[in-house]
């Protein structure tokens, strides 16, 4: 514990909150261009080939973003919209690509949870 004299000399520093999605720079979403589209494997105990993209954002950051849903049409130079939200079993993946906007097509034949995958209501 510091003495009063030490506190007078050097005041206590407030603890700074760490942002969970710093690359968005306080915006709800950011536009970016895919630099690379590939698959990675999740950490234990899960097993899969998860689709991710390396995205260069308009804020200047290059991030790894998860591509949600079954099948996708993304390739290098695709323009995508990125939102925050991590993927628990993929270390370093702290962003999601928004489906159904810009170059990311919506998920085909999706009936439930459509809003998360950019699918319009069926007539």
UniProtKB/Swiss-Prot annotation:
It comes from the Eukaryota. One of its GO terms (molecular function) is structural constituent of ribosome. GO terms for biological process: translation. It is found in: Plastid, Chloroplast. GO terms for cellular component: chloroplast; small ribosomal subunit. Keywords: Chloroplast, Plastid, Ribonucleoprotein, Ribosomal protein, RNA-binding, rRNA-binding. Its main location: plastid. With S4 and S5 plays an important role in translational accuracy. Located at the interface of the 30S and 50S subunits. PANTHER family: 30S RIBOSOMAL PROTEIN S12 FAMILY MEMBER. Belongs to the universal ribosomal protein uS12 family. Part of the 30S ribosomal subunit. This is Small ribosomal subunit protein uS12c. It comes from Pinus thunbergii. The lineage of its organism: Eukaryota, Viridiplantae, Streptophyta, Embryophyta, Tracheophyta.
């Amino acid at each position: 514990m510091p003495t009063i004299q030490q506190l007078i000399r050097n005041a206590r520093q407030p603890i700074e909150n760490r942002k969970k999605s710093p690359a968005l720079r306080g915006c709800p979403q950011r536009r970016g261009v895919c630099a690379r589209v590939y698959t990675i494997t999740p950490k234990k105990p899960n097993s899969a080939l998860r689709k991710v993209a390396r995205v260069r954002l308009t804020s200047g950051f290059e991030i790894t973003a998860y591509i949600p849903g079954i099948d996708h049409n993304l390739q290098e130079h695709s323009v995508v919209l990125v939102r925050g939200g991590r993927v628990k079993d993929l270390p370093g993946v702290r962003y999601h690509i928004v489906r159904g906007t810009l170059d990311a097509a919506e998920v085909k034949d999706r009936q439930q949870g459509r809003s998360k995958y950019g699918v319009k209501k069926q007539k």
